[in-house]
Amino acid sequence: NKAYNDFEWHWYHFNGTDFDAKRNKSGIYLIQGDNKGWADNDLVDNENGNFDYLMYANLDYKHPEVIENIYEWADWFVETTGVQGFRMDAVKHIDSFFMRNFIRDVKEKQGQDFYVFGEFWNGNEEDNNTYLEKIEKRFDLVDVSLHNNLHNASTAGADYDLTTIFDHSLVKNHPEHAVTFVDNHDTQRGQALESTVEEWFKPAAYALILLRED
């Protein structure tokens, strides 16, 4: 409705959608055209082969007009709200080449103290290491592996070896780039990523993330 800028979204600003209005059918549809397609396999998470598409109308982060509008939105949002950082959601579904350059340019404009972290929901140690390399460690990541360890410890009880609680975690491998947490909105009961840390273990879990040396 052009309330904040004059940009108009058109079909070519997207690379996929989940509904064919002409045939009234739901599905995952790849939008075809010049320079269209999903992000390259090595730029998004490899779950399901290529996890560029998540839901609804999927932005094409290769399109120059999309890139320009996101940059303008970032400038407007920071200026309007005065925020001093971003939490980037679901970054494993976004072209990592775009993310690397976007955060680089945001920090060049806002200052290196502008804090950014991303929700890269992947508990695999190697995948996290690789992603940090791809984005040149320009922003931090939530420590999903540590959360999974906390969840497993809380459900296993006395059978869990606490000496392994930090194994394979970001906080062990890249402590300066790890954002630790116990639970969040995605891990609570009934959610797709349900992995709730049991209540009896939460005091110990918070002690582990808040009192750690690194």
Give each language-model segment a name.
Residues 1-16, 20, 72-214:
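Active-site-proximal helices and loops of the catalytic beta/alpha 8
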Residues 2-52:
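Core domains of carbohydrate- and sulfate-ester-processing enzymes
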Residues 32-80, 91:
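Active-site-adjacent "subsite" loops/lids of carbohydrate-active enzymes
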